């Protein structure tokens, strides 16, 4: 990519999009463009067309998506498939119609079958049923990567699909209902620590920053205690969903950004499959670490980092989701990129960011 080329980052205020924006700036790219959801609704095809007509980006990074954890995926199934399909169709479609030189589409490793062989290679896609809890979201992401693949095969475009593992980092979503497991766990344990220590100043400040079901720092103490209890948070302990036994892989969002920019700079569609392949498929790239940790061990790592003195319990009546999700990192390594930040360092960086952000 040319340093002066116009690069549109869809979702530039989000966890990954903001990290990609910073990474591009640090590497000397000077013509970045983005729009907030309020400025541009990616569900609105007419608005997306108008944006592309006006801005004419040379490169597009599609990091915008409708995302959430197990609770949200289970409850709002229609929203997850409909909204993600619309976003993808609008942005990828207008990228094609406006002659974008290269596009990067960010998916998710939830595209892989529930019982896929571990670690999951790219070729595991569509070999058996998906995990039920996030099936609508996964199907939307599969459609997105197949759209990229199909445009490349039919029209000779250069659209690359990448499938990141579980991401965490600066600007993460800490909403207790909709956030992913790691940020949700950090916030729950932090709030329980504050309750345990009687630190109501920080509890109220936290709720002012991120209200929960309409409850904020100005709410009555009884209301705050009740809403926190409904999410398993009390001064005596934290209750987490499931058994704690599932294994998960995590990648620091700024490393995901670095891998994304590396691929935009150095990898083309032709590099994503073996020469001479007759049936070209599964050209997406796993972005991951190849290392895993149990949910229970992650919880205890966060307990240690925060200094929380209460108990951690697991509710086996709640779903675990997929029991193991370890991705195969071979293709990414062969293309030339490796991660550097492991989960212990990442949790420390994440909690420090959370505390510093609260001070701003």
Positions of PLM-derived features:
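C-terminal substrate-binding subdomain of Rossmann-fold SDR/epimerase-dehydratase oxidoreductases
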Residues: 11, 15, 19-27, 191-360
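NAD(P)H-binding glycine-rich loop region in Rossmannoid oxidoreductase-like domains
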Residues: 45-85, 94-97, 109, 114
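Short-chain dehydrogenase/reductase
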Residues: 81, 85, 133-145, 175-183, ...
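Conserved Rossmann-fold NAD(P)-dependent oxidoreductase catalytic core, especially the SDR/UDP-sugar
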Residues: 89-134, 160, 173
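Active-site Tyr-X1-5-Lys
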Residues: 132-165, 181-197
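Adenosine-cofactor binding site in Rossmann-like domains, unifying the SAM/SAH pocket
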Residues: 25-50
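SDR active-site strand-loop-helix element
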Residues: 10, 35, 60-64, 103-109, ...
């Amino acid at each position: 990519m040319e340093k002066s080329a116009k690069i549109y980052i869809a979702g530039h205020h989000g966890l990954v999009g903001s990290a990609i924006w910073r990474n591009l700036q640090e590497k000397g790219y000077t013509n970045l463009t983005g729009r907030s959801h309020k400025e541009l609704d990616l569900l609105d095809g007419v608005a997306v067309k108008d944006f592309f007509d006006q801005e004419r980006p040379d490169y597009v990074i599609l990091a915008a998506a409708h995302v959430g954890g197990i609770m949200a995926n289970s409850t709002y199934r229609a929203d997850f498939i409909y909204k993600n399909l619309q976003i993808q169709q609008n942005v990828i479609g207008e990228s094609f119609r406006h002659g974008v030189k290269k596009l990067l589409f960010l998916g998710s490793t939830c595209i892989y079958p529930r019982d896929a062989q571990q670690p999951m290679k790219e070729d595991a896609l569509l070999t058996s049923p998906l995990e039920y809890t996030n099936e609508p979201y996964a199907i939307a992401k599969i459609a997105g990567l197949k759209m990229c693949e199909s445009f490349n095969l039919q029209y000779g475009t250069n659209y690359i699909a990448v499938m990141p593992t579980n991401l965490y980092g600066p600007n993460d979503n800490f909403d207790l209902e909709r956030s992913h497991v790691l940020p949700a766990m950090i916030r729950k344990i932090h709030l329980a620590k504050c309750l345990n220590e009687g630190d109501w100043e920080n509890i109220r400040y936290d709720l002012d920053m991120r209200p929960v079901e309409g409850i904020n720092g100005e709410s009555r103490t009884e209301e705050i205690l009740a809403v926190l209890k409904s999410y398993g948070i009390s001064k005596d302990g934290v209750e987490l969903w499931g058994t704690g036994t599932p294994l998960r892989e995590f990648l620091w969002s700024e490393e995901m950004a670095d891998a994304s920019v590396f691929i935009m700079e150095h990898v083309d569609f032709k590099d994503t499959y073996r020469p001479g392949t007759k049936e070209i498929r599964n050209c997406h790239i796993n972005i991951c670490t190849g290392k895993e940790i149990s949910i229970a061990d992650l919880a205890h790592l966060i307990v240690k980092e925060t200094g929380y003195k209460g108990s951690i319990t697991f509710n086996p009546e709640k779903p675990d989701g997929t029991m193991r999700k370890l991705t195969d990192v071979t293709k990414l390594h062969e293309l030339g990129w490796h991660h550097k930040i492991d989960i212990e360092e990442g949790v420390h960086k994440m909690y420090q960011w959370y505390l510093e952000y609260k001070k701003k």
